[in-house]
């Protein structure tokens, strides 16, 4: 379904008679100073947004389309201002737009996938204490406090190797196998659409919509700050459905970030979140809380992993693992079947680069795209030398940072990385699903078990980061190569842009994280910045070390049940006809509110409701404007984080505490 939609969109922009057919500029001229500046600014803003989303719920929508729109807005405005000032400037091309978008995505992807809210943050003392100092397997040797220096070094050591691991196979995967990479194709469709006469008019409407929603969101966040001068104060604690519902986390917290995210995510994701919130906070946790004294000691603290909090964390993990394992096996199956069928074709050589015969224009476009993509190749020796160099650096540096992870474990990880990266990138090209987190979780369990009780927690989480980083970056690069292929952008300039963005991200991400870490109460399970995945990853490592003995009473049986439910739900959605199948909830989305509460699920559903009503009133306008308006809501609220965190660091507190109590 997704692939068919993308192919329809692709054919639409290829049919536009006004599409830019000029010869692409040389690859060095595609990388401009203004594109790097634009990507730096977008990367910083989106790094803040990604970290806020990661540290609050861990659920982050795909922001690639949004970043392409912002890159167009920034560079188009730049060229127009200079032209009005009478300053000569080079034309703004779709290749430059692609470079800016690629560089920006590479930058904020480090904040998104760098482990700041999961496996790296899970090493700190607070998460160790929240997990339970008396929990077997939760060794005090497994503590490493966050630091700008070691985090930046770790990112530089681990983030670049994924850029070179699959470079030799780019032609095979993009041209020969014709993998669609739906997200990369959709981004290319958007960028190509901008650079047409019709697309320019549409872009102006989107820019106006973005500016209005951005202003509204930023002003609302600024206004709401004045009323949040204390714990559980402000509009974020507004008892929309009453005080009892507020205690169960069911309320609208006026977060424009999550309303915007809900507009981007599908209705199924948002409804799955709400279903998970109702099932957990509305039914299960109140029932289990009544069993205090029977299932777990009544004297335990609320945050004890042997009490109610343990059920929240481990059942959430069971859903995540069940969903992840099913999709992992499914993607491997489809990848293997597709790969085998291609290899078994006797006439594969003649059909690999076949050109459509029904449209001369489409045929010419495809020829130009393939020609540009193949002409400016990246030398094989460069990729091999780069992989060996970064592997050697990692094998030396990572055991120095983390003595618990021995050098030979790092060596094994890098020997396995190319094959794992290929499987993941091939699967992502078919399904648009990046399974890097599941490869990382597999590495976590294996390494935690191998390293033993004393070193297992740290070794497991760091190994998870190594594998996930390589596998994720290589798949993202293939998405970018697909975008570059369809916008006739040189692979060399794409790789350089990705490297520049990654380098910027390795500096920006730790600094942005420490803005949150110093200004806000990160890791407080009763606060806004719960960092749920730090707790989840540390507990997964403990399970890897200890096995099921780490779980509270009857929790293992519940985990088995929810693991089976996750597998069954995915199986039902794949096997049932489309009509009933589309209503089966997504276990991965259901799992998030199990730990963090239901308020953000209500925000997301309100975003979904806005999109639903808008499409009922004017579907054509909604299809054009929803991404722009949603991006504005996310960026406005996200940008307010910068001044609010600086005020918090300066000890400037909001003047008013608005909260609500019962009248009697």
Swiss-Prot record:
Primary location class: membrane
Chain segments annotated as transmembrane: 31-51, 55-75, 103-123, 147-167, 209-229, 268-288, 314-334, 378-398, 409-429, 457-477, 496-516, 549-569, 594-614, 629-649
Knockout consequences: No visible phenotype.
A GO term from the CC aspect: plasma membrane
Tissue: Expressed in roots, leaves and weakly in shoots. Restricted to the veins, to the central cylinder of the young roots and to the pericycle and the endodermis cells facing the meta-xylem tubes in older roots. Expressed in the vasculature of sepals, petals, anthers, stigma and siliques, but not in developing seeds or in meristematic zones.
Keywords: Cell membrane, Ion transport, Iron, Iron transport, Membrane, Transmembrane, Transmembrane helix, Transport
Locations listed in the record: Cell membrane
Membrane topology of the entry: Multi-pass membrane protein
One Gene Ontology MF term: oligopeptide transmembrane transporter activity
Record keyword Cytoplasm present: no
Reported induction: Inhibition upon iron and zinc deficiency. Not regulated by copper. Subjected to diurnal regulation.
One Pfam match: OPT
GO biological process terms held by the UniProt record: monoatomic ion transport; response to iron ion; response to zinc ion
Membership in a protein family: Belongs to the YSL (TC 2.A.67.2) family.
Function: May be involved in the lateral transport of nicotianamine-chelated metals in the vasculature.
Name the UniProt record assigns to this protein: Metal-nicotianamine transporter YSL2
């Amino acid at each position: 379904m997704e692939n068919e939609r993308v192919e329809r969109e692709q054919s639409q922009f290829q049919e536009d008679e006004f599409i830019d057919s000029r010869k692409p500029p040389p690859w060095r001229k595609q990388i401009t100073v203004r594109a790097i500046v634009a990507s730096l600014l977008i990367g910083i803003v989106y790094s803040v947004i990604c970290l806020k989303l990661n540290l609050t719920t861990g659920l982050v929508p795909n922001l690639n389309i949004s970043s392409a729109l912002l890159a167009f807005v920034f560079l188009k405005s730049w060229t127009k201002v200079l032209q009005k000032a009478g300053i000569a400037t080079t034309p703004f091309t779709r290749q430059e737009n692609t470079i800016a978008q690629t560089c920006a995505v590479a930058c904020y992807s480090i904040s998104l996938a760098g482990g700041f809210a999961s496996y790296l943050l899970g090493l700190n003392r607070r998460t160790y204490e929240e997990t339970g100092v008396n929990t077997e397997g939760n060794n005090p040797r497994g503590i490493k406090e966050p630091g700008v220096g070691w985090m930046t070094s770790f990112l530089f050591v681990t983030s670049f190797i994924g850029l070179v691991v699959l470079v030799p196979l780019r032609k095979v995967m993009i041209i020969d196998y014709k993998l669609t990479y739906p997200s990369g194709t959709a981004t290319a469709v958007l960028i190509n659409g901008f650079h047409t006469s019709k697309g320019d008019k549409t872009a102006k409407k989107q820019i106006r919509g973005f500016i209005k929603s951005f202003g509204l969101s930023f002003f609302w966040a600024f206004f709401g700050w004045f009323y949040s001068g204390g714990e559980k104060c402000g509009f974020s604690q507004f008892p929309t459905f009453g005080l009892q519902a507020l205690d169960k986390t069911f309320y609208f917290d006026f977060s424009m970030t999550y309303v915007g995210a809900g507009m981007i995510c599908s209705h199924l994701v948002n409804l799955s979140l709400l279903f998970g919130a109702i099932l957990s906070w509305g039914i299960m946790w109140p029932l289990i809380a009544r069993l205090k004294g029977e299932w777990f000691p009544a004297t335990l603290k609320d945050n004890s992993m042997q009490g109610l909090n343990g059920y929240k964390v481990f059942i959430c993990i069971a859903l995540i693992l069940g969903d992840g394992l099913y999709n992992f096996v499914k993607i491997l199956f489809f990848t293997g079947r597709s790969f085998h069928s291609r290899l078994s074709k006797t006439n594969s050589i003649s059909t690999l680069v076949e050109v459509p015969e029904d449209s001369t224009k489409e045929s010419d476009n495809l020829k130009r795209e393939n020609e540009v993509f193949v002409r400016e190749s990246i030398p094989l020796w460069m990729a091999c030398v780069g992989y060996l160099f970064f592997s050697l650096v990692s094998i030396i540096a990572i055991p120095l940072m983390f003595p618990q992870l021995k050098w030979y474990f790092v060596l094994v990880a890098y020997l396995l990385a190319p094959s794992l990266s290929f499987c993941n990138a091939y699967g992502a090209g078919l399904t648009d699903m990046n399974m890097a987190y599941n490869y990382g979780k597999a590495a976590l369990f294996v390494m935690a078990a191998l390293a033993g009780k004393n070193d297992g927690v740290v070794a497991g989480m760091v190994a998870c980061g190594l594998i996930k980083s390589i596998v994720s970056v290589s798949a993202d690069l293939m998405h970018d190569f697909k975008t570059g292929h369809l916008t006739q952008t040189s692979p060399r300039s794409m790789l350089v842009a990705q490297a520049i963005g990654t380098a910027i991200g390795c500096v920006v991400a730790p600094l942005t994280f420490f803005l949150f870490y110093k200004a806000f109460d990160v890791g407080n399970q009763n606060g806004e910045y719960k960092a749920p995945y730090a707790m989840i990853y540390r507990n997964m490592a403990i399970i890897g070390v200890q096995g099921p003995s780490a779980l509270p009473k009857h929790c293992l049986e519940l985990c088995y049940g929810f693991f089976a439910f996750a597998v069954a739900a995915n199986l039902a959605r794949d096997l049932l006809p489309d009509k009933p199948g589309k209503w089966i909830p997504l276990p991965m989305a259901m799992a998030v509110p199990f730990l963090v509460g239901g308020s953000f699920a209500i925000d997301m559903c309100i975003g979904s409701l806005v999109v639903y009503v808008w499409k009922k009133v004017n579907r054509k306008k909604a299809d054009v404007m929803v991404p722009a308006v949603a991006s504005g809501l996310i960026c406005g609220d996200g940008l307010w984080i910068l001044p609010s965190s600086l005020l918090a660091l300066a000890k400037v507190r909001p003047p008013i505490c608005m909260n609500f109590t019962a009248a009697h």
